[in-house]
């Protein structure tokens, strides 16, 4: 705070130099842009929201996004890894964002809906103990009004998903259980109903995940750029959430297969896994994408969400090696964030299908965490100007027409819970 006050005191003395430099810049580039266009570029910031991974801990992001929208701070660009890519893809599908309906949709999640037995084939993902069924669970949500799959280019808010590509040399050296098309060792049919963390074999695999959090093993790949704008949004989010050796995703859309083949070839990788392995809170990647012209402006406020920072919990000591490895990434990413929200408390990262009451609790926690950030983001997003008594009026942004199916259509496609366990769980927690 003292440093900010000192900077404000110095600012008045720099005003003259700033005015002079502004005039020189406008004169030098008079054939490229007008003074009004320069002022509009410098005076207005875009909101870039970076959503980090963290499994079930990321349910707090729903409440965080609710608070952002309440403040009128709709993201201009979203980028996410792992669970953050799932929430980002959902929020980006339509404008205005029907956040309350998304909360109702999230409350229909179950383990049987999102997890299944390991697949018999492997082509683009990495063999795991479970098949990730998010694409099936969210099929209606990621359909256009005409019934086609929503592609990255169809999203109402610009969104990109970060996946980790396993380098070919590292992929070839992996144990066969990671590469071969075989059933996982854990085959109990009851597991999809239960928290993923209960199985000792799953816990053992999770310990091995830390080995993938290494730039010599994986590299970050951004899905949503010009080369990948035709990817299905649900496939991008699913690959970004595929914990190596635990959750395995493969596309079910034949149209996607040549696109994925090309992605592996172009990036010289052997498989796509959880984006958190390469960049769990990808603020640096967000900054580079904006620098490269993603938004048409470089003047942006970078707000980062992190739910997977080390938190003491004796029930989940097995997560410590992973959270510590992830924190090493933050040394590189944190300087690019204007503000970093470290959510606390959170749900367990292993709780991938919380009950209705538990989701409500996570939303409250997330709402409270982001509420403390609103004064900061509000100040950062305040326009600035040089002439007159008010900021220049920016040009009207083109209206974005949502092509996503209505939420009433999505909700009507969700089967009501028929399993006694699901009904009992929600009744007990309501």
Where are these regions (language model features)?
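Active-site gating loop/helix substructures
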Residues: 160-288
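C-terminal helical/tail subdomains of lipid-metabolizing enzymes
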Residues: 272, 277-279, 290-300, 304-311, ...
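Conserved small-residue
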Residues: 54, 64, 84, 161, ...
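Patatin-like phospholipase
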Residues: 55-144, 165-167, 171-194, 375, ...
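Phosphate-/polyanion-interacting regions in eukaryotic proteins
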Residues: 1-16
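A short alpha-helix-loop-beta-strand transition element characteristic
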Residues: 143-159
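Lipid deacylating catalytic domains
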Residues: 109-114, 129-130, 177-183, 224-226, ...
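Helix-rich "cap/lid" substructures immediately adjacent to catalytic or cofactor-binding pockets
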Residues: 15-78, 430
